[in-house]
Design a protein with these regions (language model features):
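Non-catalytic structural scaffold of enzyme domains
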Residues: 1-202
Length: 202
């Protein structure tokens, strides 16, 4: 995988992916009803989250749902206060049939998985709307957030986590294509304009 290659190339620097932290957190929270993974089509077809979840719990029912339109909506900024009826319709469409995909037990009616894993780093911008749609009894796990927690914990263990105020901190962003677009889209996720964006050639 690309993560494995990068980890080898950048040793001893740690390289993180979002799949394992997200899967680990979802597996911990999940019950026998299983986990519904929401991600892009390529991620679902690739099966990375499904494999990672089953490594954590081989008996865990895992369901995948590709939601490619959500990425487009997020990148166009149709989120939060800018969300439209189209956004709401697309979210409902992405969750369609999700009650019917859960396992049947003793010929009883299908049950809704009680854990939803946001398997794309674009999807947290829709988290509140997704939580409202799936109901309060469903746990929504954000793979991006769990990855950030993992990185923070590791930095703390290594004594590299910054303590105290972050007034003098500086964020640097590296983009492999389209700096202007990266700034625009990134602003939706960071809640403001991005500075210090540089184009890099990999």
């Amino acid at each position: 995988s690309a993560l494995k290659i990068l980890a080898e190339d950048f040793t001893p620097l740690p390289v993180y992916g979002v799949v394992d932290p997200g899967a680990q957190a979802a597996a911990v929270q999940a019950d026998a009803s299983g986990v519904l993974v929401l991600a892009t089509e390529s991620t679902i077809l690739g099966g990375a989250y499904q494999r990672a979840l089953l490594r954590e719990n081989p008996s865990l029912p895992v369901y995948g749902r590709a939601c490619p339109l959500w990425v487009t909506l997020a990148e166009q900024g149709w989120v939060g206060d800018q969300a439209t009826s189209l956004t709401q319709h697309a979210l409902k469409h992405g969750l369609r049939g999700f009650l019917r995909e859960a396992p049947q037990r003793s010929m009883q009616a299908p049950q809704q998985p009680k854990t939803v894993l946001l398997g794309c780093t674009h999807f947290p911008v829709f988290r509140k709307q997704i939580e409202a749609l799936v109901g309060a009894d469903v746990q929504v796990v954000d793979s991006a957030q769990t990855t950030a927690i993992t990185v923070s914990d590791d930095l703390s263990k290594l004594g590299l986590l910054r303590d105290g105020p972050a007034a003098n901190h500086e964020m640097v962003f590296l983009a492999t294509d389209g700096v202007a677009r990266f700034r625009k889209v990134g602003g939706y996720f960071f809640g403001g304009p991005l500075r210090n964006v540089s184009l890099v050639d990999l």
